[in-house]
């Protein structure tokens, strides 16, 4: 699905877990500076990605990850809308649907960098690494993952990097962790939170 927002073209696609692990890099790989790259890389909480999130992926049958936002560089992206049958228009939405659905192709030279969802990506990479534990559930590598591909029309490498670094900063600056009250209300795996919720309901 293709969409536009001021200054950006973005596309919602799906990748297999093994494809995402192989093809998508981390934001620190966008930096031209080795020092800045190392600094960004250290921001990834490896213990959280490999232990907590890896355990979640390997042990839960109802596992689910939200979309990973990815910057796409190079590769000559091309968007081609698909042809739909206008007769199949029961809901009167044909025009809107026809504009949104299509095929996004690259020439093979593209590079992907995770702007949001780096810990999710790290946990997937770790789980599919045969040298690490825990082991992935059967068939995990072929499960689908939602990816949001971000494109910019800036051809100059410097302008491209500035724009995507700004987006990376915005996405992560305004991210807000779940507060304790919301955790108590919504949590279904933390025994303490569940007991607290029951006490509050009966008091």
PLM features per residue range, with description:
Residues 1-80, 85-94, 101-104:
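N-terminal extension/subdomain marker
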Residues 64, 70, 74-75, 81-203:
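Basic- and aromatic-enriched surface patches that contact anionic nucleotides/nucleic acids
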